[in-house]
């Protein structure tokens, strides 16, 4: 099976063309491939499939390192767009794809940057999904470590966002798993720790569902900015600094799609026998 290794700000992916080759992946196979010592190693595996709708170009599937399938990955979307172009699967500048929970438009800006229309943030608790009687800008969550105030949103996957004073002093790897698996998130959640520098600039660390802390999380950056705007602490165009690099997020507010712009880097091509 042929594949490419790619990354978006250090969030790394194994990308597989399921259009021109037959691909059958089980959770066990994905876990073996994800092993950084005995396999390829990655945060997520991205699978390019033919479209289910003639008006779309591709279907986009995402698998975490633990083998679980998820509906969204923003950094992966940028790498997906770069991959299908590099492999000659399309020559379009605007690439229309479906995911498990919706549709996206991926736009190639230059040799490195890709702009992604992430769709509208979803706030209704039942659709996140999150257990709450109604939408609120802030929720209180209690864990064995501490009680936190957070915002909750879906960008096609569930995000819980906490505002912190200093991300370097925050116990991300202790608090992250407790919130990821909190009983109020029936499908678990990605946990964002956001430090507001000013109204147009944040620093962010993300503990990803099924992957742990990663160098960057595109949908996490989108979720953090959306929560910050809803809570009134951020403006509509925000630079997000993650451990692996920076993203630019734009959102005009409720009723509008959210846009993410950032790098997508091809590392190497490979072949592996399953």
From Swiss-Prot:
Pfam families for this protein: DAP_epimerase
Residues at which substrate binds: 11, 44, 64, 74-75, 157, 190, 208-209, 218-219
Gene3D superfamilies registered for this protein in UniProt: Diaminopimelate Epimerase, Chain A, domain 1
A GO CC term assigned to this protein in UniProt: cytosol
GO terms, biological process: lysine biosynthetic process via diaminopimelate
UniProt xrefs under PROSITE patterns: DAP_EPIMERASE
Active-site positions on this chain: 73, 217
Record's keyword terms, sorted: Amino-acid biosynthesis, Cytoplasm, Isomerase, Lysine biosynthesis
Catalysed reactions, semicolon-separated: (2S,6S)-2,6-diaminopimelate = meso-2,6-diaminopimelate
Highest taxon listed in the record's lineage: Bacteria
Enzyme nomenclature, EC number: 5.1.1.7
InterPro entries: DAP_epimerase_AS, DAP_epimerase_DapF
Molecular-function GO terms, alphabetical: diaminopimelate epimerase activity
Site annotation Important for dimerization: residues: 268
Subcellular localization: Cytoplasm
Assembly and oligomerization: Homodimer.
Family: Belongs to the diaminopimelate epimerase family.
Identification of the protein by name: Diaminopimelate epimerase
